[in-house]
UniProtKB/Swiss-Prot annotation:
Pfam families: YihI (PF04220). Residues 1-18, 56-65 have a biased composition (Low complexity). Residues 25-34, 92-114 have a biased composition (Basic and acidic residues). It comes from Serratia proteamaculans (strain 568). This is Der GTPase-activating protein YihI.
């Protein structure tokens, strides 16, 4: 039987494909020990509190040794003395421009058209309780509106109704003569 002939191959060179040399058992054991030793020594060295100071003081042999556990040596006043403290000087602001002052009419119109105030008043009408901050805002804004209306001479319609009722009561007293009927 004739077998086909094999083509001659080129000899392998060691530079083309390097062979992985298997490590012996002793070499593997040695590497494992080194790896284990490196893993064991993680973290900070013990006694670092004293070692840090000792490395700094190697240069200063004449300096006295300090114990890092002892705190500050700043003197503490045992008796309270009343000394007026100097107030820090406020830094001058770079030409703070005053806000343009609104006329009372403009300010009143602005406050009456305030969306936040309207929303808060709607919440009050719905029976909700407001936070302290919101209630303070409502009170301040309504007080300012009242002050502006007084300044401008604007009166609310509620006062007119009360005055009319008082006049009617007085007329009834004068005509009827008996003050107990009115009450």
């Amino acid at each position: 039987m004739n077998q086909p002939s094999k083509a001659p191959r080129a000899p392998r060179s060691s530079a083309a494909t390097p062979k992985n040399k298997k490590k012996s058992r002793a070499e593997l054991d040695q590497e494992a020990r080194e790896h284990k030793r490196a893993k064991k020594r993680r973290g900070l060295a013990s006694g670092s509190r004293t070692q840090v100071e000792s490395t700094n003081q190697k240069n200063k042999a004449a300096a006295q040794a300090k114990d890092p556990r002892i705190g500050s040596k700043v003197p503490v006043a045992l008796v309270v003395e009343d000394k007026p403290k100097a107030k820090p000087q406020p830094k001058p602001k770079a030409e703070a421009k005053p806000k343009p002052r609104l006329t009372p009419e403009e300010e009143l119109a602005k406050l009456e058209n305030d969306e936040r105030l309207d929303a808060l008043l709607d919440r009050i009408d719905d029976g909700e309780t407001l936070s302290a901050e919101d209630q303070k805002y409502v009170d301040q804004t309504l007080d300012r509106i009242d002050a502006l209306m007084e300044q401008l001479g604007i009166e609310l319609g509620d006062d007119d109704e009360e005055e009319e009722e008082k006049r009617e009561d007085i007329l009834k007293l004068l005509k009827g003569g008996n003050p107990k009927d009115v009450i």
